[in-house]
A protein has these predicted regions:
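Extended, charged catalytic domains and RNA/DNA-binding interfaces, predominantly
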Residues: 270-277, 291-640
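Extracellular, repeat-based ectodomains that mediate carbohydrate processing or recognition
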Residues: 1-342, 457
Length: 640
């Protein structure tokens, strides 16, 4: 670890599982790759730090026997010491951060999920293993920690989340950043002169405005919820990134690098230190020198090309920070108990079917424009969204591509969180194709799917859902935009697909089992009834599903749910139910619906010799039912 040595540390999926790997470049010559984590753990989230000229420590989160734990391993000279578990046996631990100071002060922090909350904890590694100390409040959702060890002291920063309501059925999260300093009496939060511990409110470009009138926002291709700490001769800085324009384009993003100095352990007013790019990162070491510091940020160009720039930022050259107050949101605790419903079941012949609730079109931060850690949103879906089934369908290519690493990592978390008969997180992704509306245009023309979208192209997306064994990611631009090649691979892997959005072209393939009628973005069947009824009138036999399509951290609470009747909560039973259309779509309410024709359950095909059909409906709403409408071939024929 002298000036001639460079170590690169990463996580990788290997045949035996996920491992932490490392490779040394000595005097410009790359050495052999070494495995740092053991085979008994599925290891992710690596970080590393140079402790001295001859010592390096690596930390990661490892899964063993359904538990995520933080482990470290140190390299002393040329000898690797045995791995050591640092987190306790309570909860599941993620995202380690390390900080070392030449005086020997060596700390490790991480976030940990237990009792339905994330919290940030840490321990001193200077002389063995010090006691684990609470850093963030225990009754809030606190995660994504970072750590800085300076002459002014040891500081930790983190993201804090509060569930909020913006009106009936409108659920989101309120994001704030916080900083704490280690003192002789433990960890103490830094405040401003008025005693306010909120260092930053992350509202602009992240959460919709509710009052005085609703103003939505869109995606962003940077790290708008990640705190960064920067050392200064006078104190430290807390930095974060925000979307410059609340309503700005996802495809042409612009971001601000915002900073708030901490002087004499007090928060100073925020300022804007850089503008015009996205995905800001601090160079190592994160240190101001002569009033300047180095950062890295990117531009995003059509076709998914990112170009990163080295920025020399000056803390004395800044512009005022301005941000409107976000009114209309109020705190809540999820799940809202009075909104939960008892498990319903129905009898069909000799079989009993349970009613399970699914959101099968969700996103996390593995999608280029979305928010939320994969582990965090699986917990959210299970514990706050009260889902039985969730599928995170990250886009194969939306502005920038989904890498193979990101796809495999998403599937890893799906399998890590699945507990048959308790909770299912199924692997999959979103086929994000756009096809031309001009007959003479080629399917494979990149202009179909790159901004500003040529050939009057329109979305032809699919939710691709695999069984737990998974399947390949077939990126539409790599197969000439040919959905037949997608269908072939999905069928071979035992998966299914569902249409998405209010524009698509049905493929007619057996793996395409359902249509997304509504989502958090709108009621598609109401917007374009001719599309959906036209498919049915032409003999299409597709299930009705509703999926949140949440890019904003709320799986299960994004305005759309699918009720599925299955014999048990297993992947096999759920996929079979979808193939047989034993399901129904709602706008997010958990209404109980049992519809039958001549005694046959919804989704079944029946024949009748006389042409007479007896329809029965049993329904229980979460609110009093106002109206029921019978529709035949796209026309309303009866209202009850």
């Amino acid at each position: 670890m002298n000036e001639k040595d460079l170590w690169v540390i990463w996580s990788a999926k290997r045949p035996e599982g996920w491992r932490i790997l490392g490779r040394l470049c000595r005097s410009g010559v790359w050495q052999k790759t070494v495995a740092i984590s053991g085979k008994q753990y599925q290891a992710i989230h690596p970080t590393a730090i140079r402790v001295s000229e001859h010592v390096m420590t690596v930390a990661w989160s490892g899964l063993q026997q359904s538990r995520f734990r933080i482990q470290t391993r140190s390299l002393q000279g040329i000898r690797w010491l045995p791995p050591r578990t640092e987190s306790d046996t309570e909860g599941n631990a993620f995202r380690p951060a390390l900080a070392f100071k030449p005086d020997g002060n060596f700390w490790l922090v991480w976030d940990q999920y237990e009792q339905n909350h994330y919290r940030v904890v840490g321990r001193n590694l200077s002389a063995g293993q010090g006691p684990i100390e609470a850093i963030s409040p225990t009754d809030m959702h606190c995660l994504q920690p970072t750590l800085l060890n300076t002459d002014q002291g040891l500081y930790a920063a983190w993201l804090q989340k509060q569930d909020v309501l913006g009106g009936p059925g409108v659920v989101s999260q309120w994001h704030t950043l916080h900083v704490a300093k280690r003192t002789d009496d433990g960890w103490r939060q830094i405040t401003d002169a008025a005693g306010n511990p909120v260092a930053a409110e992350l509202t602009q470009g992240l959460v919709a405005q509710i009052e005085p009138q609703p103003v939505a926002t869109s995606g962003y291709l940077g790290r708008r919820t990640t705190p960064m700490l920067l050392a200064d001769e006078k104190g430290i800085w807390l930095l974060w990134e925000r979307k410059s324009d609340h309503r700005g384009s996802t495809a042409q993003p612009r971001g601000d690098l915002v900073g708030r100095q901490i002087l004499q352990d007090q928060l100073q007013p925020a300022v804007v230190l850089a503008q015009g790019k996205v995905d800001y990162h601090l160079a190592h070491p994160a240190q101001v020198s002569g009033g300047k510091f180095v950062a890295l940020a990117s531009n995003v160009y059509p076709g998914g090309r990112r170009l990163y720039h080295r920025l020399l930022c000056d803390v004395n050259q800044h512009t005022p920070f301005q941000q409107a107050d976000w009114q209309g949101w109020r705190p809540t605790e999820l799940p809202i108990q009075e909104e939960l419903t008892e498990r319903q079941q129905i009898q069909v012949g000799e079989k009993t079917y349970q009613l399970y609730w699914a959101d099968m079109h969700c996103h996390n931060n593995l999608s280029s424009d979305a928010e939320g850690e994969p582990d965090e949103l699986n917990y959210y879906a299970r514990d706050r969204g009260a889902l039985d089934v969730v599928v995170f369908t990250n886009n194969d290519f939306y502005i920038v591509p989904l890498t193979q690493y990101e796809y495999e990592l998403g599937n890893f978390f799906a399998n890590a969180f699945t507990r048959p008969k308790q909770f299912l997180s199924l692997p999959g992704y979103e086929w994000t194709s756009r096809i031309p509306g001009v007959k003479t245009a080629r399917l494979s023309d990149p202009g179909n799917w790159t901004h500003p979208y040529n050939n009057r192209s329109y979305p032809n997306h699919r939710s691709v859902i695999y069984p737990p064994a998974g399947g390949p990611v077939i990126r539409f631009m790599e197969v000439e935009n040919d959905i037949n090649r997608l269908n072939y691979e999905v069928e071979k892997a035992g998966g299914i697909t569902l249409t998405q959005h209010p524009a698509f072209k049905p493929s007619g393939h057996p793996v395409e089992v359902g249509m997304e009628l509504t989502s958090g973005w709108g009621n598609y069947m109401q917007q374009v009834p001719q599309l959906f009824h036209g498919i049915l009138n032409q003999g299409g036999r597709l299930a009705f599903v509703a999926c949140g399509d949440s890019h904003r951290r709320a799986p299960g609470l994004s305005g759309a749910l699918t009720g599925i009747y299955a014999e048990e909560l297993t992947a096999e039973s759920i996929l079979e139910a979808l193939r047989k259309r034993r399901c129904f779509a709602t706008n997010g309410s958990r209404v109980f619906v049992d519809t039958r024709a001549n005694g046959s359950l919804m989704g079944e095909a029946i024949t009748t010799e006389t042409g007479d059909v007896e329809l029965t409906l049993q329904a229980t709403g979460t609110r009093p039912i106002v109206r029921t409408t019978l529709i035949h071939n796209g026309k309303q024929i009866k209202t009850f």
